[in-house]
A protein has these predicted regions:
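Intrinsically disordered, low-complexity regions enriched in Ser/Pro/Gly/Gln/His and often acidic
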Residues: 10, 59, 91-93, 147, ...
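Conserved active-site-adjacent core of cysteine acyl-enzyme catalytic domains
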Residues: 55-124, 130-139
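N-terminal hydrophobic targeting segments
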Residues: 1, 111, 117, 121, ...
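Short, flexible coil/linker elements and helix-boundary hinge sites characteristic
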Residues: 41, 94-95, 110, 168-177
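Low-complexity, intrinsically disordered short peptide segments enriched in small/polar/basic residues
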Residues: 2, 14, 131, 147-150, ...
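Noncatalytic regulatory segments and standalone regulatory/sensor domains
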Residues: 136-178
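Active-site nucleophile-adjacent alpha helix/oxyanion-hole segment immediately C-terminal to the catalytic cysteine
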Residues: 1-75, 80-81, 175-178
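Long, contiguous hydrophobic alpha-helical segments, chiefly transmembrane helices and signal peptides
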Residues: 32-36, 127, 134
């Protein structure tokens, strides 16, 4: 179901809604878990469980100088590979997540450059984008007219196809990428 909002006055064309699915409303480096939870409509604790497992498997305590707690939980951040692993692991028990993919493409953070429902990878932050609005615990759209860079998105394969069809399957000609 697509929700339509009035035109946004922000340079990104996106609206902002404060949403923090963390049970205690804490905000401490768990942007990947928040974005996954909000974009996939999956309960935060389930996403966190799978994310922590992906992080533990990837690091396996190989870098003790970073600190034990940071490496063992998603509160210390999560990499692109760990987000993809988390989605793949979640898909084993939730079929609707099976066709989520990561698409790498360089663009700017603007409504017209993103699929309707996706997780935008802003290099040092990931954020849930749904129907022309971002959903996060803080406003990551930026405070200046210069648009932030996006280096890729996670989205359902059907959303990506719809996005590509909207731009006649040529993102360069459509001005989405340069």
């Amino acid at each position: 179901m697509t929700i339509s909002f009035p035109k946004s006055s922000h340079p990104t064309g996106l609206h902002f809604f404060t949403r923090n699915p963390h049970p205690k409303k804490e905000d401490h480096g768990d942007c990947g878990v928040r974005a996954l939870s909000l974009a996939t409509d999956t309960e935060y604790r389930f996403v966190k469980h799978y994310a922590d497992d992906a992080i533990a498997q990837r690091h396996d305590g190989d870098q003790p100088v970073w600190g034990y707690k940071r490496l063992q939980t998603s509160y210390g951040g999560i990499t692109r590979q760990e987000i993809t692993t988390t989605l793949n692991d979640m898909a084993k028990s939730d079929r609707k997540l099976y066709d989520w993919i990561y698409v790498s493409y360089k663009t700017v953070f603007h409504k017209d450059n993103l699929p309707e429902i996706c997780i935008a990878d802003q290099d040092n932050h990931v954020v849930c984008v749904k129907d022309g609005a971002i959903y996060d615990s803080w406003d990551s759209r930026g405070k200046t007219k210069k648009l932030k860079k996006v280096i890729g998105v996670w989205c359902h394969r059907d959303m990506w196809q719809k996005f590509m069809d909207k731009h006649n399957r040529d993102l360069r000609t459509a001005g989405v990428v340069k």
